[in-house]
Design a protein with these regions (language model features):
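Conserved PLP-enzyme active-site core in the AAT-like
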Residues: 14-17, 23, 35-53, 57-62, ...
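C-terminal segment of classical bacterial N-terminal signal peptides
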Residues: 25-30
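Generic N-terminal amphipathic, Lys/Arg-enriched alpha-helix
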Residues: 51-61, 72-79, 342
Length: 409
């Protein structure tokens, strides 16, 4: 884990960042009021749903990420016309594959959909009779091998296509588990390092036995290189979310890999009626929106993003630095984590008179609502979904909550 322990001359930092007057004199109500006046989300509030500042991450439960303006424009433009959907899917898949340097690609309605379609492709190999029959996979190759420590709720998406999960814990067990019923090896990228079986074991075993290997890389952007590098390692299919790091439509995903497997996935997908993917509809708006998102992401200045995100975390750390017993750490996770700056904030709960859970709840209950991660050993903040200026609101609100508790303690 690459860590930067925060060491601050608080006044000097706040002056340089333009925050000294904000922390020293402005009342929180004025700051929050100005924020809400500029970004209030009235259409949501009319429904009783409060928009939030997202310092937690690209979770689907918090609606992933906010689309780039160019993506919204592309979707609006797409909405004005009728097109043959199959032709559009094939054309956009071909364009994306060429852009990122992979054999083939297709737009799905999300990373979980990519899991289902990848599994269906590997089980059916595009055979029309099998396509119509699944999830009834009686008599077919239907076993999907996973590392036991990689099991998760999302493997339901493989089972939905009729896949039977076979668990292994060692390279030896992986080798023994592969047989004439094995349809796919299923690796979860974020769980690399869990257990004794790594990605190289999976890739090598798949090659030896001619079994397709799928990598669920839903949230593995950034880094941008993941778009081609994971397939380049030897995986036959890789699935990404379109509505997380790429800032594409929330109801979109990307499945990339071998040409014949992507073709088989298409046969299992919308708009074909008698398929497992018919209910996973991705419309022309999402397809064109994701194409634009990939174009933007491919050309983006990712180094600038990293500098900006680290600045967000450092500013929040500076703003809570005078809380008794506070300990802040800006860090980038190691293997298995997302390579972007996070902030961990810890304090002595007895000295401050406030538990992490209580602070977490007050952040959510306040106005504006702020979401962070409560890790029980401290609060963790993610930089990716913050807009410039929001870090000041987060820092002021955390400081307000913590100092108020410390005064009462």
């Amino acid at each position: 884990m690459n860590r930067f322990r925060t060491s601050w001359d608080r006044r000097k930092f706040l002056l340089a960042a333009g925050l000294a007057s904000t922390v020293g004199s402005l009342r929180p109500g004025n700051v929050y009021g100005a924020y809400l006046a500029n970004r209030h989300g009235e259409s949501y509030r009319a429904l009783g749903v409060r928009p939030l500042i997202n310092a937690a991450g690209t979770y689907t439960t918090l609606t992933g990420s906010v689309m780039a303006p160019e993506v919204r424009d592309a979707m609006a433009e797409a909405s004005r016309y009728f097109v043959p959907l199959i032709d559009l899917q094939l054309a956009v898949g071909e364009r994306i594959a060429k852009m990122i340097g992979v054999e083939a690609a297709m737009v799905s309605c999300g990373a979980a959909s990519s899991i289902t379609l990848a599994t269906a492709a590997c089980i059916t190999q595009g055979d029309p009779d099998k396509v119509r029959r699944i999830p009834d996979t009686t008599g077919m190759k239907n076993e999907v091998i996973m590392v036991k420590s990689h099991r998760m709720g999302f493997d339901h998406a493989a089972r939905a296509a009729g896949g039977k999960i076979i668990e292994v814990e060692t390279p030896e067990e992986l080798e023994k588990a592969i047989n004439e019923k094995t349809a796919m090896l299923f690796f979860v990228h974020v769980f690399e390092g869990r257990g004794k079986v790594n990605r190289n074991h999976f890739i090598a075993a798949g090659k030896r036995h001619n079994v397709p290997v799928f990598n669920d890389a839903a949230a593995e952007l950034p880094p941008a290189t993941s778009l081609s590098a994971i397939v380049g390692e030897g995986f036959d299919l890789v699935g990404f979310s379109g509505g997380k790091g790429m800032r594409g439509p929330q109801a979109s995903g990307l499945l990339i890999g071998r040409k014949e497997l992507i073709a088989a996935a298409h046969k299992n997908n919308n708009p074909h009626s008698d398929t497992i993917g018919r209910g996973m509809k991705v419309g022309k708006e999402e397809i064109m929106g994701l194409l634009k998102a990939v174009e933007i992401y491919h050309k983006r200045d990712h180094d600038h993003d990293q500098v900006q995100w680290r600045g967000f975390m450092e500013r929040i750390a500076a703003m809570v630095s005078d809380v008794p017993s506070i300990d802040t750490e800006v860090y980038i996770p190691g293997p298995g984590g997302h390579p972007l700056p996070y902030l961990r904030v810890k304090w002595d709960e007895r000295k401050v008179g406030l538990t992490y859970a209580e602070c977490f709840k007050q952040l959510q209950d306040g106005e504006p609502r702020i979401d962070v991660n409560n890790k029980n050993t401290g609060l963790e903040l993610a930089s990716y979904n913050l807009f410039p200026g929001e870090e000041r609101i987060v820092g002021m609100r955390m400081r307000e909550i913590l100092l108020a508790a410390a005064k009462r303690a």
